[in-house]
Regions:
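Intrinsically disordered, low-complexity regulatory segments in ankyrin-centric signaling systems
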Residues: 1-39
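Conserved ankyrin/ankyrin-like repeat signature
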Residues: 32, 64-65, 95-96
Length: 103
């Protein structure tokens, strides 16, 4: 799967099913996430297993991305197996937890 011309993802990886937004959110790439949102990507987009960009950002301690996604309409209450808050709590990311609890 090729996401774009500068993507580090392999072109022929049939096992990788991450949408671009979830991928870049998991890496903490604010610039790429902002660009996708400007292009109209749904901030609540999920992968095949229901994992959202907000969950990816929260679980990986990317507070700036969590704030960005929330400001663009990401559903804080969304739950696949866990909510973004629960994932941040399990990973012990105190700032992300505090922010999500403040909403």
């Amino acid at each position: 799967m090729k996401l774009n011309s500068f993507s580090p993802l392999p072109e022929d990886d049939e096992e990788l099913h991450l949408p671009e937004l979830v991928y870049w959110a998991s890496l903490g790439d604010v610039e790429q996430v902002e660009q996708l949102l400007v292009e109209g990507i749904d901030p609540n987009q999920t992968d095949d297993e229901g994992y959202s960009a907000l969950q990816a950002a929260a679980e990986n301690d990317h507070l700036a991305l969590v704030k960005l996604l929330v400001s663009k309409g990401a559903n804080v209450a969304y739950k696949s197996e866990y909510t973004a808050l629960q994932l941040a709590e399990m990973a012990e990311h105190a700032e992300v937890v505090a922010y999500l609890k403040s909403l």
